[in-house]
UniProtKB/Swiss-Prot annotation:
Residues the entry annotates as binding a divalent metal cation: D30, E32, D145, D217
Cofactor(s) the record lists: a divalent metal cation
Task performed by this protein: Ubiquitous transcription factor required for a diverse set of processes. It is a component of the CCR4 complex involved in the control of gene expression.
Any Gene Ontology CC annotation: nucleus
Pfam families assigned to the protein according to its UniProt record, in alphabetical order: CAF1
Species this chain originates from: Arabidopsis thaliana
Protein name in the entry: Probable CCR4-associated factor 1 homolog 5
Length: 278
């Protein structure tokens, strides 16, 4: 399904990513990381959500990055294994680590055979700088995905405020950064409350690879995004008679303007008594 990227095949796979980007203008991303050191109440303000996310991302190491490049009839996926996380020494959420292990991540192998985070992002930054033209970045509930990507590309802690974070994301990634979870809320029969797998099930899409592996999750995110764009554009075209490309532009603008922070690390509001999972 995906090209697994390790220390021993890094250069060949990075060259493949560089070549593929010449033909694709869309990238779906997913991250696997050691969970959250601080959990955020569901009713927290945007600034508190951002403060907690910054603390979590600044103090933990990314374990996997999934990249799916797609467009012009091409779809190709890479799963980059990153070696900085040390289970015995690095800060982590024990429940999240157990969850990753139960879903098949071999943390010992990733530690021994993976790529250093700084080494990977130095070359990935160069590859992105070679890309000319607008890029579309696609996430699913993607605040942490964007945050780890930003941390890797800048090789710095996250900005101090959510406003600075949004500005830096736009500066580095451009204006067109989509969140498929939000898009699902615009579609008949779906909801922004649904997880990625449930949305795929409703759309009758079969997963390729294992859930909660960054490569498989990014690939499924890319396919769901493509389907939702197609359905949204065509449904609006039928109802308004406007050209499909005009409708897609409006959707892009709407996605860009939706700045509400979506977090993957939170605790339930006590009065509701409901449990939420990552």
């Amino acid at each position: 399904m995906s090209g697994e990227v390790w220390r021993w095949n890094k250069q060949a796979e990075m060259n493949s990513i560089r070549d593929c980007l010449k033909h694709c203008n869309s990238i779906a991303i997913d991250t696997e990381f050691p969970g959250c050191l601080k959990e955020t109440p569901m009713d927290a303000s945007d600034e508190i959500r951002y403060r907690d996310m910054k603390f979590n991302v600044d103090n933990t190491h990314l374990i996997q990055l999934g990249l799916t490049l797609f467009g012009k009839g091409i779809t190709k996926t890479w799963e980059i294994n990153l070696s900085d996380f040390n289970e015995s020494k690095s800060l982590k959420n024990d429940k999240s680590i157990a969850f990753l292990k139960n879903n098949g991540l071999d943390l010992d192998k990733i530690r021994e055979e993976g790529i250093g985070i700084e080494e990977f992002f130095m070359e990935f930054s160069q590859i992105l700088n070679e890309k000319h033209g607008k890029m579309r970045w696609v996430t699913f509930q993607g605040s942490y995905d964007k945050a780890y990507l930003l941390k890797g590309l800048t090789r710095k802690p996250l900005p101090e405020t959510s406003k600075e974070f949004d500005e830096t994301v736009q500066q580095l990634l451009g204006r067109f950064v989509y969140d498929v979870k939000k898009m699902a809320g615009l579609c008949s029969g779906l909801s922004s409350r649904f997880g990625l797998q449930r949305i795929a099930d409703v759309l009758q899409m079969r997963r390729v690879g294992k859930a909660h592996h960054a490569g498989s999750d990014s690939e499924l995110t890319a396919r769901v995004f493509t389907k939702l764009i197609f359905d949204l554009v065509n449904s609006r075209k039928e109802s308004t008679g406007r050209r499909a490309d005009d409708q897609q532009y409006q959707l892009e603008q709407q996605q860009h303007q939706q700045q509400l922070m979506m977090t993957r690390c939170y605790i339930p509001i006590p009065v509701q008594g409901r449990n939420y999972v990552l």
